[in-house]
C-alpha cells in the first residue's frame, strides 16, 4: 500500500508539474497570434516542428532564449520578414528561398551572396533556417550594425549625414567623393531627410553578411570592369588601402582576361565592321550577310579572326598605361584641391587624358590591327614583326600614326556623352519611378549603361570610321581618297551622305550583348579565383536577365525613342521596383 506521505508527495509533485506547465503557457502567450503553433508542446512529449522533432523542454528553452528581451512588436516584425523570405511557405528558409527573395525583395544585395548569408544564419550547415535561427541572426546583426552606426554618428544626434559618412569612410581607408557618399545616404534614406537614422541603416543592411563597414563601403563603391569590345575611357578608382593590398592589380588582371576572351569570341563582328567601314559605299553596297559570305569564301572560318591576336595583345599595355596615368592625374588634381574630393567632371577629364596618353602609346598596334583585319590569305606568312617592318620600309614611321587625330578627338565625345546620358537616364528613372531611392536596380542600371554606351558610340562613330579609312588608305583598292581627317569628312559627306559615316555600325552593335555577357562571366570567375572579395552589384545569375533587357533596350532606343524611358522604367522589362522602401514594407 502507498502511505499518506507518498500519496501527499505524489499529489504535490503533480501540482508542481501543473504549475510549471501553466507558467510555461504564460511564457508562450507572448507569441500572440502564433501561440497556437507552439502551445501543443505542453501536452505530448515530442511534437513536430519545422526541423523534425524536438523535446518539449528544448522547445521551451529555445522560446525563452529567443524572447527573453524581445518585444511582441519586434517579434512580429521579424516574423513578417521571415515569412516573406520563406518563398515556398514550408516553414523554413533554404538556399532557393533566400536566392529568390534576394532577387525580388532586396535587389540591393546580390543574390550570389545567398550561400554566405545561409552559412551565417545556419552555422551547423543544415541547409535550412528555422525562425529561431533567423531571429538570432537578425538580433545579432542589428547589434553589430548599431555599434557601427554609433561610430559613424560623430555628433551623436542619432543621424548620419553625407559629411559624417565621408569622414568615417576616409578614416577607415576607403575615401568617397561627394557623389558616392550622397548616393549611399540616399540609398538608405526612406524619408527624404538627406540623412540616415539607426532604424533605416539596420533595415537596409539587415541581410548583408558582413558587419564590417569597409566591406560594406567596398560593396557599394566598386564597378565591374566590363569589356564591350571597345576601349573604356574612364579607368576604375581604387583607394590607397586597395593599392597597398594589391587589390588593384587583381582587378586589372581579371579585366584583362575578360577582355581577351570577350574580344576573341566577338572577333568576327569586329572584322566585318572594319571591312564594311573601308569597302562599303553607295557604289559597292555591302551588308552584314553579304560581307559574311564574301569573307568566308576568301579565307574560310579562320579568316574571321584576322587581326584578333594583336587586338588582344594590346589590352595589357593599354590598360596598364591608362591606369598609371589616371592615378597620377588624380593625384595631381587632388594635390591642388587639398582635402576636397575629386568631382565627376574632374574624373572625366583625368580619364579622358589618361585614355589619350595610352592611345598615343599603343596606336601603332591599332593601325596594325586594322591592316591585319583587311589582309588577304597569304599576306602574312612571316609573322607580325615582319609585317610591321614591311610597313615601315614602304611607308615610313608616319604610317603607324595614320588616323591618329580623329581617334584622339573621338575620345572626348564618347566618354563625355556616355557619362552624361547614363547619369541623365538614371536621374530620369529615379525621378519618375524611384522616389525613395537614389539609384535603380541592377537591370535598369545595365539598361541605362548599355544605352549610354550606345549613344557614346553613335556620337564618336564618324571619327572611328574616318580613323579606320585613314589607317587603311594605302591598301584600299578604290579610287584615291583624301589623306586628311577633314578631307575624309568632306569626301564621305559629298559622295555617300550622312549615312556614309555609319558604315559597319550594325555589327558593332550586334557584338555589344555577347561581349558584355562573356566579359562579365569571365571577370567574375577570374576575380573570384584571384581572391578578390565580392563587391559588385550583382552576380552571374543576373546575366540571363540582362540579355533580354539589353537587347530590348537597344531596339526600343533606336526604333521607339519616345517609349524608351517606359522600357527602362520596368514596365516593358517587368523589373519590379520593390527596392524603393527596402525592408520598410515589412513593418507595415
UniProtKB/Swiss-Prot annotation:
Swiss-Prot/TrEMBL keywords: Calcium, Membrane, Metal-binding, Mitochondrion, Mitochondrion inner membrane, Repeat, Transmembrane, Transmembrane helix, Transport
Solcar repeat boundaries on the chain: 246-332, 342-428, 440-529
Transmembrane segments: 252-269, 307-326, 352-365, 403-422, 446-463, 504-523
Polar residues: compositionally biased ranges: 1-14
PROSITE patterns linked: EF_HAND_1, EF_HAND_2, SOLCAR
A Pfam cross-reference name: Mito_carr
Disordered, as annotated region: 1-25
Binding-site residues for Ca(2+) 2, renumbered to this chain: 153, 155, 157, 164
Membrane protein topology class: Multi-pass membrane protein
Assembly information from the UniProt record: Homodimer (via N-terminus).
Function field: Mitochondrial and calcium-binding carrier that catalyzes the calcium-dependent exchange of cytoplasmic glutamate with mitochondrial aspartate across the mitochondrial inner membrane.
Name of the protein in question: Putative calcium-binding mitochondrial carrier F55A11.4
Taxonomic path: Eukaryota, Metazoa, Ecdysozoa, Nematoda, Chromadorea
